[in-house]
Amino acid sequence: MLYIQLETREMLMSKIFKLYQIVIDKQLSDLINTEGWDCHIDALSYRNASEGDPTFGIINDCYTHVADLVCDDLDHCFEVGNGYGSADRFVKKTGVNRTSVSVGDLIEDEDGLLHLVDSIGFRNVTHLKTTPHM
């Protein structure tokens, strides 16, 4: 269990948030560079999410659970996810390279509410949640 790894009382009182991202690997990156952003469903979803609309990515199951963040709130998730504070609060999933929290990413709280990292702040997009694993 994740709590066993945590040592301070403050961290034990924090919540666990799930970070979801649309992963662009080298192969997809090469394809995007050759054919443009409309070349693949993940690329199009990534572009749309970066512009504030995660609908296509959520509906088409393009998001991957890349990390758990042990934080107090969404703002704290943004800080921890971008390298500020204790590295123990950022628990990446196996096989995932170090990542940062960016516009277009999704953060799910312990209540199951889904939040889009927007250009300024966060937006609740729980109503778009349709995939069983999210």
Describe the residue ranges of each PLM region.
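Conserved ATP-binding/catalytic motifs of P-loop helicase motor domains
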Residues: 134
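Short, Lys/Arg-enriched N-terminal segments with co-localized hydrophobic residues
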Residues: 1-12
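A short beta-strand micro-motif
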Residues: 5, 15-24
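Short conserved micro-motifs at the rims of enzyme active sites and ligand-binding pockets
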Residues: 29-31, 128-129
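Catalytic phosphate/metal-binding cores of nucleic-acid and nucleotide-processing enzymes, i.e., regions
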Residues: 12, 23-29, 36-58, 113-116, ...
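Short, compact, well-ordered microdomains
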Residues: 96-131
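Short, conserved turn/kink motifs that form compact alpha/beta structural patches or helix kinks used as
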Residues: 47-106, 110
